[in-house]
Amino acid sequence: MDGLTSSDSIVIAVVPRDRFSMFPRCLEALYAYTDVRFRVIVVAGGADRTTKEYLHELQLQKDNMSVVLVDRLLMQGEARNIAMRQADERFCVVLENDTIVHENWLSPMLECMREEGAAAVMPLIFWYRGIHAAGCILEEREKDGAVVFHHKIMYTEIRRKQIDYPECHCILIDRHLLPGIEVFDDVEPFDVDLGLTLRKYGLSVFLEPRSVVTYSAGPPWEVRDMPLTNLRWDAASWKAHNRRFMQKWGVTYNPSAKLASYRRQQFKLGLARWYPSRITVGLSNVGASLANRLQSLVIRGPHRITWGKSRQLR
């Protein structure tokens, strides 16, 4: 892979995850700590008036920023694909707006991509419980006549390494290795689908731990966040997208662990899910803060996918 030259530019696509209110923190850090030439594409679907005004004002201040507003709420894949279609640059970072970058976050990922020939690189991701993700792996083993397929997040072996799929909070992509491939699809698990798609085309993914970002999970929420939050944490929608995942890859999937995480999130949101107001959202913020402290004691296990015996992806 050719190295990054002075004539190259990076495009950073910033998309919402589940809170519009996180745009200021994300974008302020992005402009403070990005040390290579870049431009920004912000995609926001169904945003509230305050968010639209903020993005409009910032766009006027920044000559390297463009904003794409869509009238309706967007799913994860939709927002990313809209941003990718706006990109002409070879190197594209997809950054969720609740992920905060830190000093020297981008150059190590570019160096890793150049040296390893990777199609995608993810940074080391922290959150309130410590390390959120140090790469992700897939495991296959024979059991009862079927291939049981595990996927799990890694928290140890903090070194540059090839991984099976990236956590999607922050990803650097080499678009030259993906000609004509739309890698983001609204199926669940979303990040596993991305990894399987890259593997299908023989493309590699790496972790570069010298690059560090922080995933800033809720709370706090604001009233204006609730429509997007409810869409993101809709268990029925997740089930539908999970069915599409199973059909796409010809697998069966045990959704219990993922659905449990959705139920925990809905419990934290409480009445704010149905009756968003300053009072209900404020109560959710207090309750969720306490719940997060308790949840930090829980160790998550791997999710499981079972493939038919004849269906092994290589």
What are these regions (language model features)?
Residues 28-37:
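Short, acidic, metal-binding catalytic loop of nucleotide-sugar glycosyltransferases
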Residues 44-54:
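A conserved acidic beta->alpha catalytic loop
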Residues 70-87:
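Glycine-rich, basic loop-to-helix element that forms the pyrophosphate-binding segment
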Residues 92:
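Short aromatic/hydrophobic "clamp" motif used to bind/position activated sugar donors
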Residues 104-140:
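Conserved donor NDP-sugar-binding/catalytic core segment of glycosyltransferases
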Residues 108, 164-177, 185-212:
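A short, conserved alpha-helix in the catalytic core of glycosyltransferases
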Residues 140-163, 168:
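Short, flexible, basic/aromatic active-site loop/helix in glycosyltransferases
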Residues 196, 200-311:
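Active-site-adjacent helix/loop segment of glycosyltransferases
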